[in-house]
């Protein structure tokens, strides 16, 4: 059974859907996509359940979420193995993701109270009350790179606020979505409070176009997110929150400090998860001169020796395959395109078996108009620069704005960088691929429109209701002009 609708597991009636390991082609999961009628049934089930769920005390909603958290902890190894098999990420990495699913729940509960709870104050003889009310039925679209951690960063705040949910995982990771839905089922959520619909483009279109949803929380590619943005134009009654990618720059100062620490920071920023994190560094700005040369020599040498293997290999690999052979071919094509434009490969990516490729480092300094694209994989573009001001100007030359970083021991350089850079996540001497669940996640421009993750997700799962209240009506000593009683 493929879909969880109105408290029942049902088979899909749409096109066939399969999930294979990206490292061995082993069949992991198969089923049939949700048809438009089944998506509609899921939305209607969520609408019916909303009427009761929103009225339940917060403590009861919280108890269901905490029960889910305990189930995640008890099944964390199974979750980690499923994610590793579907995505190809090393097991050590997916174990971290499984732990983060439960860990983020505590943040979401605290955020509910601090950002969307209820406050009361007195002013001029009036009682001023701020309450928050759920939006209604929320559609949640999950990505493939963090198929457990990221969608639950939307699902949990939505449920805590009193919304009901229709969840569509990535078509690349349906098994992970099903495993997590089984845990929500075991947590005892009432029928229809959360629903699962599996499928690819047609299923997603049907869900996004449904008149029955009140909001949509999306994590994924800029291309899909921009289509959703156009689709939602003219519908101010629906909340749309988009988390998308970036063409993220990291500037290496001449004052970068320890060589090995800097190289390690770059590798962690560019090649972790095989470059399949939205915050990964895509453009590396390196100073002209001997210090920049030494850095690049060491970076290329270390990157060429990175261990690449399947998720369960011993010794453990740093990188696994990409999520699919199509994704791997896209990176190889991007490399060829950049070479054709005048880029010089310092380390050329090579196709291995299945969806494995080796990482690429390419000097694109000579390219006059560098394509402003997010290459979602292990491809790092290097640009040599003369001054920090020039590097920052080049770094800002993008329609995206998700993350950016500076590696420098000079406080003055950091002050200049943080004042002039345009990005939502800006790190100093730290990898770009780490983010705090307590902090806003997202960026301006083509990287998204809101910050609907973790602590700040609460803001987009409920609307504020402001009230001025009194026990009785009041008759003022002086009436408004033109009124006689």
Swiss-Prot record:
Alphabetical list of Pfam families matching this protein: Aldedh
Q: Which GO terms describe its biological process?
A: arginine catabolic process to glutamate; arginine catabolic process to succinate
Under Enzyme Commission nomenclature, its number is 1.2.1.71
Its catalytic activity?
N-succinyl-L-glutamate 5-semialdehyde + NAD(+) + H2O = N-succinyl-L-glutamate + NADH + 2 H(+)
PROSITE patterns annotated for this entry?
ALDEHYDE_DEHYDR_CYS (PS00070), ALDEHYDE_DEHYDR_GLU (PS00687)
Active site feature: 243, 278
Q: Which domain of life is it from?
A: Bacteria
Give yes or no: UniProt keyword Oxidoreductase: yes
| Keyword set, alphabetical order | Arginine metabolism, NAD, Oxidoreductase
Give the pathway annotation.
Amino-acid degradation; L-arginine degradation via AST pathway; L-glutamate and succinate from L-arginine: step 4/5
Residues recorded as binding NAD(+), renumbered to this chain, are: 220-225
Q: What Gene3D superfamilies does this protein map onto?
A: Aldehyde Dehydrogenase, Chain A, domain 1 (3.40.605.10), Aldehyde Dehydrogenase, Chain A, domain 2 (3.40.309.10)
Which molecular function GO terms apply here? succinylglutamate-semialdehyde dehydrogenase activity
Q: Which family does it belong to?
A: Belongs to the aldehyde dehydrogenase family. AstD subfamily.
Name the job this protein performs: Catalyzes the NAD-dependent reduction of succinylglutamate semialdehyde into succinylglutamate.
The protein in question is named N-succinylglutamate 5-semialdehyde dehydrogenase
The protein's organism comes out as: Vibrio cholerae serotype O1 (strain ATCC 39315 / El Tor Inaba N16961)
């Amino acid at each position: 059974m493929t879909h969880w609708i109105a408290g029942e597991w049902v088979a899909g009636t749409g096109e066939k859907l399969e999930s294979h390991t990206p490292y061995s082609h082993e069949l992991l999961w198969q089923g049939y996509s949700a048809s438009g009628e089944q998506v509609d049934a899921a939305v209607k089930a969520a609408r019916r359940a909303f009427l009761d769920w929103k009225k339940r005390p917060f403590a009861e909603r919280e108890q269901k979420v905490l029960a889910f958290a305990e189930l995640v902890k008890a099944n964390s190894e199974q979750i980690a193995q499923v994610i590793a098999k579907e995505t190809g990420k090393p097991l050590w990495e997916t174990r971290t993701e499984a732990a983060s699913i439960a860990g983020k729940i505590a943040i979401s509960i605290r955020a509910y109270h601090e950002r969307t709870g209820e406050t009361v104050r007195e002013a001029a003889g009036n009682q001023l009350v701020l309450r928050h009310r759920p939006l209604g039925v929320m559609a949640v679209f999950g990505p493939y790179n963090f198929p457990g951690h990221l969608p639950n960063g939307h699902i949990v705040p939505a449920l805590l606020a009193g919304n009901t949910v229709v969840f569509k995982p990535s078509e690349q990771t349906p098994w992970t979505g099903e495993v997590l839905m089984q845990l929500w089922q075991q947590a005892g959520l009432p029928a229809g409070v959360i629903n699962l619909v599996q499928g690819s483009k047609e299923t997603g279109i049907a869900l996004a176009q449904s008149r029955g949803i009140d909001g949509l929380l999306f994590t994924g590619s800029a291309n899909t997110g921009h289509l959703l943005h156009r689709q939602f134009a003219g519908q101010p009654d629906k909340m749309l929150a988009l988390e998308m990618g970036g063409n993220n720059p990291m500037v290496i100062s001449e004052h970068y400090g320890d060589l090995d620490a800097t190289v390690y920071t770059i590798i962690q920023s560019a090649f972790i998860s095989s470059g399949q994190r939205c915050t990964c560094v895509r453009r590396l700005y390196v100073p002209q001169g001997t210090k920049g040369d030494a850095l690049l020599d060491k970076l290329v040498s270390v990157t060429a020796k990175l261990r690449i293997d399947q998720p369960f290999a011993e010794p453990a690999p740093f990188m696994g395959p990409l999520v699919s052979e199509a994704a791997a071919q896209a990176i190889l094509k991007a490399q060829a395109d950049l070479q054709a434009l005048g880029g010089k490969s310092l380390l050329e990516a090579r196709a291995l078996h299945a969806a494995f490729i080796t990482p690429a480092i390419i000097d694109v300094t000579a390219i006059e108009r560098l394509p402003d694209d997010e290459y979602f994989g292990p491809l790092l573009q290097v640009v040599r620069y003369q001054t920090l001001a020039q590097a920052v100007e080049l770094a800002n030359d993008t329609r995206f704005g998700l993350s950016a970083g500076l590696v420098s021991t000079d406080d003055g350089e950091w002050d200049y960088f943080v004042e002039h850079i345009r990005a939502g996540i800006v790190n100093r001497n730290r990898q770009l691929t780490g983010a705090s669940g307590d902090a806003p996640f997202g960026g301006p421009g083509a990287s998204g429109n809101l910050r609907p993750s973790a602590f700040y997700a609460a803001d987009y799962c409920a609307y504020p209701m402001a009230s001025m209240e009194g026990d009785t009506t009041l008759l003022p000593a002086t009436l408004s002009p033109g009124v006689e009683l």
